[in-house]
């Protein structure tokens, strides 16, 4: 019986996601056993500055990918939105399980909705994507950076001078806290989700055919297709955590991919947005990127990167 070593970050959410996925594999009843290896990433250690300031790409995955390449582990369970657009040679996303709710969750101290927040209220987020889109809707708000895992951020909302914070609905759902803490879900038209938000990425070595066969049982074709379109768009624009960039795809009634893509200025005063429909994930992602480039996306990205230096 083969033992599969599964790499995971140490946070409660990461371990919850990893153990959930292992349970899906165990339910297949095939002759494998599993062991979780906890790995500390750079993103877990650097908590005193925003992700964009420390070069956001791959902050939560590099050490785990190193463990894959050196065969310390056989596969890793990541949040898809943490994955860089390009993976190291020899590694691949071997499986995308079914995506859960991709929306952002708005959590306010007083129970007020986003629209009801008092003028000048303090909004906590560590995401340039969220801050740009929410400042575009409410320029009167103040954004204050907030870092840490879910529990830490919820505690900071209670104890510090934040009026509200934004978290991914998916993480709260996986922890079983969504009904308890969420004031409202932000509609995708107000705040386009991050590329891959709500989805998991199961990363493994390209040459591990045995494991790839096992992972194929859990793969969700719809999630694979939609996330592929989003990631092609992200790759073409070379967007990471340093840029307000968003991309969310769904499957239409006619089985086409519909991708809404966005690039913004840091302060939300400019938001470029395009929706592209097509059948091929790569073509849809490239078309969305090309249309935004024509609108001036590259200039916004350049300005955002300069602002981070």
UniProtKB/Swiss-Prot annotation:
Belongs to the HMBS family. Monomer. Binds 1 dipyrromethane group covalently. Pathway: Porphyrin-containing compound metabolism; protoporphyrin-IX biosynthesis; coproporphyrinogen-III from 5-aminolevulinate: step 2/4. PANTHER family: PORPHOBILINOGEN DEAMINASE. CDD domains: PBP2_EcHMBS_like (cd13646). GO terms for molecular function: hydroxymethylbilane synthase activity. The porphobilinogen subunits are added to the dipyrromethane group. Keywords: Porphyrin biosynthesis, Transferase. Tetrapolymerization of the monopyrrole PBG into the hydroxymethylbilane pre-uroporphyrinogen in several discrete steps. It comes from Bacillus cereus (strain AH820). HAMAP family: Porphobil_deam (MF_00260). Its cofactor is dipyrromethane. This is Porphobilinogen deaminase. GO terms for cellular component: cytoplasm. It comes from the Bacteria. One of its GO terms (biological process) is protoporphyrinogen IX biosynthetic process. It catalyses: 4 porphobilinogen + H2O = hydroxymethylbilane + 4 NH4(+). The modification S-(dipyrrolylmethanemethyl)cysteine is found at residue 241. Its EC number is 2.5.1.61. InterPro entries: HemC, Porphobilin_deaminase_cofac_BS, Porphobilin_deaminase_N, Porphobilinogen_deaminase_C, Porphobilinogen_deaminase_C_sf.
